[in-house]
Amino acid sequence: MASVTSLTASVHQRLADALSAALPEAGSADPLLRRSDRADFQANGILALAKKAKANPRDLATQVVARVESGEVIKDIEVSGPGFLNITITDQAITRNLAARYEDGERLGVPLAEHPGTTVIDYAQPNVAKEMHVGHLRSAVIGDAVVQILEFTGENVVRRHHIGDWGTQFGMLIQYLIEHPHELDHKGAAEVSGEEAMSNLNRLYKAARTLFDSDEEFKTRARRRVVDLQAGEPETLAMWQKFVDESKIYFYSVFDKLDLEIRDPDVVGESGYNDMLDETCRLLEESGVAVRSDGALCVFFDDVKGPDGNPVPLIVKKSDGGYGYAATDLSAIRDRVFNLKANSLIYVVDARQSLHFKMVFETARRAGWLNDDVQAQQLAFGTVLGKDGKPFKTREGETIRLVDLLDEAIDRATAVVREKAEKVGLSEQEIEENGRYVGIGAVKYADLSTSAVRDYKFDLDQMVSLNGDTSVYLQYAYARIRSIFGKAGDRTPLAHPELELAPAERALGLHLDRFGETLDEVAAEYAPHKLAAYLYQLASLYTTFYDQCPVIKPAPAQEVAENRLFLCDLTARTLHQGMALLGIRTPERL
């Protein structure tokens, strides 16, 4: 495995060295290198440096140009405007760099982080005994993409799925199951489907709720059962575990449909921190971070006030002795920092919970659990909207079941795949498999191509379109490239650095070389949408290249054909790897 220095980094270093030579007092000055439509790069840093040194910017720019060691990388540098530098790269440097990436297998020359840390990512957090709905989609999809991207950079990533598996509602459910012990029995099937598991839970929940609302004696028994659950009474815990296990059958079936890997050891729900709650509260109170207010243990903040102007506290422990969500979240922070040794905590959680997490993180900082060496941040996401721009609901105003949404996406995508299947020669099995890949990819990409914090419209017509910024467009671009190699005969992909590149080849090559630096930015900002934008631009540049630069017909010269096949293959591999990091599959034939 050999990492490859990007052309951007090579040019940046040469300019920085020349700047230091021309203006020693500037130290290691930043040339502020940017992509440009006037050349391959433009450097804008000289203007500010000249102003600081009371020098003429054009004169300083001319001195810098004279000191640049161009080598085989820089073809031309010109001074433009008040002191900008326009830099053009040699064709040879572009092809050599791409050849080095090509030789590096799946990593494509992308270096591993020099100083990897440990990041805990909290994402995909459904609730036990409750159906997953469209609101659960974004945390799962965004979180999984961030996990894949960080792991690719070499970070040690610990996944956590903080499922809602505790609370007073379990008293009602457990009591009903004790009185109706066969409600969660499976009808002789060796393997229960997720749909059947959820059907069992739904039926039991509705029956328990009806009884709870109509029978005072049952309500009393259910409330006593909550006390038993919190005390760890064995029979009660055994019944509670049945709900958790049945729910996991359902959860895992939905995540499997979403093509997400969820591992059982990574599922640590609210109950996983029960043994820490008392100590968390004690530590907060003893340190003075939390104080008693009307019998409750609270943390106050100067900048958090209610409509009446009075402070709104974070309630860690209620006046009746019960623990709030904050106690669980703060205990989870302690576990992740001190037991898992995390440097970074990422919470992929709805933006509507931002105030809660702001207060939780500030409390943890005051307690000394978070500091400059251990950071926590919420990767907040917006709402999924319908075509009308309103929160996505059924016509009856109900929340949409996630599994129904995914099934519809797969059905629509399968119809799109089937339209072209005969031309490509796909079997029925391939049509169904590709339909799943395209449908689930469409749902994921629509989410991931939007900045997480923004709301986005769920429009299946647009999502499965072959035109525009969709995963289907990218998947078809990949499949189209793979099909070229079936027509290439005895010609193979081979880099030819000695060849002059056409404008479309240069544009594609420069973009391919930016894959690593794009991933650096994406990983640093937890911004999968920037990777999606890179891949869409890659597919668009490839389309232009394919239209303008014949690969097979009319047949170009041998060396030109080999070099273009090399660009095709590297584009396909970059698309494949980039889409995989977003959790999207790329079928070989579409």
Curated annotation (Swiss-Prot):
InterPro entries reported for this sequence: aa-tRNA-synth_I_CS, Arg-tRNA-ligase, Arg-tRNA-synth_N, Arg-tRNA-synth_N_sf, ArgRS_core, DALR_anticod-bd, Rossmann-like_a/b/a_fold, tRNAsynth_Ia_anticodon-bd
One example GO MF annotation: ATP binding
Protein known as: Arginine--tRNA ligase
Keyword Nucleus: no
Keywords, sorted A to Z: Aminoacyl-tRNA synthetase, ATP-binding, Cytoplasm, Ligase, Nucleotide-binding, Protein biosynthesis
Pfam families: Arg_tRNA_synt_N, DALR_1, tRNA-synt_1d
Gene that encodes it: argS
Reaction(s) the record says it catalyses: tRNA(Arg) + L-arginine + ATP = L-arginyl-tRNA(Arg) + AMP + diphosphate
GO BP, one annotated term: arginyl-tRNA aminoacylation
Species per Swiss-Prot/TrEMBL record: Streptomyces avermitilis (strain ATCC 31267 / DSM 46492 / JCM 5070 / NBRC 14893 / NCIMB 12804 / NRRL 8165 / MA-4680)
Subcellular location, record wording: Cytoplasm
EC identifiers of the protein: 6.1.1.19
Major place of residence: cytoplasm
Keyword Transmembrane tagged: no
GO cellular component, one term: cytoplasm
Family in the record: Belongs to the class-I aminoacyl-tRNA synthetase family.
Motif 'HIGH' region per UniProt: ranges: 126-136
Domain of life: Bacteria
Quaternary organization: Monomer.
